[in-house]
Amino acid sequence: MERIKPRTLSGFMELLPAQQQQMERVMDILRTTYSRYGFTPLDTPIIEASEILLAKGGGETEKQIYRFSKGDSDLSLRFDLTVPLAKYVALHYADLAFPFRRFQIGKVYRGERAQRGRFREFYQADIDVIGDGELDIMNDAEIPAIIYDVFSAMGLKRFQIRINNRRVLNGFYSMLGLTEQSGEIMRTVDKIEKIGPDMVRAILVDDVKLTGEQADE
């Protein structure tokens, strides 16, 4: 009988005991901090119906998910915690009190090429506030405080919190007289880490038809 060589699949992680203890400490800090700010813990299935996970993701999402069939069921492993949250709220809407403040810490799976810093199985630690109508902007302002408390409790001394808020951005674009182009501008600026500021500026000028001065601002 051929011997089977033990191995861990590429992009998946197994921790040694000391590393797992460190991981548990991080998880405890997250749970404690999130709970202190009034967020309720939530857990959702790792496996969902493919039609739910792919409802809004399009072809790019389909390339990333682990998808399989069991009998007549078309199933997939969750690739984030946001889509399962949307399903959960839609399913249990009548039983929830709004604004619904939840946190969820769990593994997600993405079938993309494993590389340094990018895994196929990894944890996400989400906090979300779901409103029944418009939410007070104070909910957005609270998030940086939570991040600061989490990182400080972990012993991190130097870190940056980058804020990306559509209301603030829309106000800025409105000030520049670019309200109609705001959606296209935001989609382009989101690519800045992938393609660099020079390419983003070129797209804003050539495709979105901004002036050079507007693109620089």
Please annotate each region the language model reported.
Residues 1-217:
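Extended, charged alpha-beta segments that form solvent-exposed binding/catalytic grooves
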